């Protein structure tokens, strides 16, 4: 995910900046109506890029996708046992036999499942709105450097709002296809 921040989101933001379609001093709320009447309405594009927006470092969105009754014990923990053997990080192991909430994920693209998250895995389109709601409701701290995934999720939304395309489609059209990288 950190690589995507610099090779995808940042690339798109730089292009839109060069084209005069956004300014670093613009509040993200200019492009994201969900932020307008919140404590996040004045967060600027620059603050998001520099991780100085006051946003929380991360939100565990996956928790909203997991059927809590399909998990034995906690979903993640710091050691391997018979239920937790999928390594997610250096000291983090996930429950390996969980199930997604009913209707949230599909093996094929459908009118409701439009967000591709992996080959053969499509997420319900409403999950993106639920993620934004979690961001809007999250705490906002003092504006100082705190590495945050949330800022780059918002930058992705800004790019998509300006271009009218998904970040993936915009990058393919503006960068990858012209460079012969499809």
Task: Label every model-predicted segment.
Residues 72-74, 79-81, 155, 164-169:
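Short, charged N-terminal helix-start/capping segments
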